[in-house]
A protein has these predicted regions:
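Loop-centered beta-sheet repeat module
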Residues: 142, 153-194
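Membrane-cytosol interface segments of multi-pass membrane proteins
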Residues: 1-162, 202-206, 210, 253-255, ...
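Alpha-helical transmembrane segments and terminal signal-anchor/GPI-anchor hydrophobic tails
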Residues: 167, 178-186, 193-268, 272-300
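Surface-exposed cleft-lining segments at the edges of enzyme active sites
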Residues: 121-130, 165-177, 227
Length: 326
């Protein structure tokens, strides 16, 4: 029963986010071509679960819907818009696909292009799916927060079955990147509900342990059988409390501090690394792919830190002159 400690997951949440983004980068850049790096897409599931888990603490302090949405948008929109604008200009220069009309620009900058126009030439690219998905989840988070744990479990079960159905029949397969993460986001809210009654409810804690071990078994069986897709994500989702609790021991000392620092830059790092241009530029100079990946990641961390400072200063400046929007 002591294998899983939700309090440690909360304490190490920022460091876990740092570990997750490094895992995602290793996946996208094919670092070392190892089996661990090939599973790095699961780092996104860690993001989603820890995001919903953390959002509940924010909602517990202030559950006003408008205030919550504005806080989330202020965190994401400035950085997101700045970086996709830079890529927008680069795509024009390199004569790549890019939005042309005002309507296309609107769907691109709002994220609606991912949901409704992802098959169009001007739609959001598949590797840009994460932010539109996360923003959509944020809009539903306050409603999930108000549900009790029984209703959340019913919703979780329904979402898992819907995901399996959509995945099995390959319905909108490109959007599977988003809809496969719906159960993960719901499960993060459930973990928060368990966290708040962790000491007084032994039944919930026992169920959490059993579901985590069952999820770990499903995860490894799915990997060994080459099933992939939904089975791997669902298995990993239930196994995450166990996985993160075991990883907590890695967070002691300097490593934990480094990962926590990186964890504060996950938004910037994610947006910067997905375009591959930095890696291509470094590889032309260095040659060796794995060394280039390490150098590129370090450079991305530095640039992400600079971007975060610039954006925060800009937002603060806008607030001081009476800007009350995003």
């Amino acid at each position: 029963m002591n294998f899983i400690n939700l309090r440690n997951i909360q304490k190490g949440r920022t460091a876990f986010m740092g570990l997750a983004i490094l895992w995602v980068i290793a996946f996208h850049y094919s670092f070392l071509q190892s089996e661990i790096s090939k599973m790095g897409y699961l780092g996104v599931d860690i993001f989603i679960l820890l995001s919903s888990f953390g959002l509940c603490f924010s909602l517990n302090r202030n559950n006003n819907y408008k205030d919550f949405i504005i806080r989330r948008l202020k965190r994401i929109i400035p950085t997101w818009w700045m970086l996709i604008t830079i890529m927008f200009v680069i795509n024009i220069i390199l004569q790549r696909n890019h939005p042309h009309s005002l309507f296309q620009i609107f769907t691109y900058y709002s994220g609606l292009g991912w949901w409704f126009f992802h098959n169009e030439p001007f739609g959001i690219y598949y590797y840009e799916w994460y932010i539109p998905t996360l923003l959509t989840f944020y809009f539903f988070a306050p409603f999930l927060f108000r549900l009790n744990i029984k209703k959340l479990y019913l919703l979780l079960i329904a979402s898992v079955f819907c995901t399996i159905y959509l995945d099995y029949y390959s319905i909108e397969p490109r959007l599977s990147l988003s809809y496969q993460r719906i159960p993960v986001f719901i499960y993060g809210v459930i973990l928060y509900k368990m966290y708040t009654c962790e000491v007084c409810n032994k039944t919930l804690k026992s169920f959490l342990c059993l579901s985590s071990f069952a999820g770990a078994i499903l995860f490894f069986v799915a990997l060994m059988c080459g099933i992939g897709g939904c089975a791997v994500i669902v298995g990993f989702m239930f196994a995450m409390p166990l996985f993160l609790s075991l990883c907590y021991k890695l967070l002691y000392g300097k490593l934990g501090k480094v990962l926590s620092f990186i964890g504060t830059l996950t938004l910037e790092l994610y947006l910067l690394h997905i375009y591959n241009l930095p890696l291509v530029a470094v590889m032309r100079c260095v040659g060796n792919r794995n060394i280039s990946i390490i150098i590129t990641t370090i450079l991305l961390i530095v640039v992400s830190y600079v971007v975060s400072i610039v954006v925060n200063k800009a937002v603060e400046k806008l607030n001081t002159i009476g800007y009350k929007g995003l």
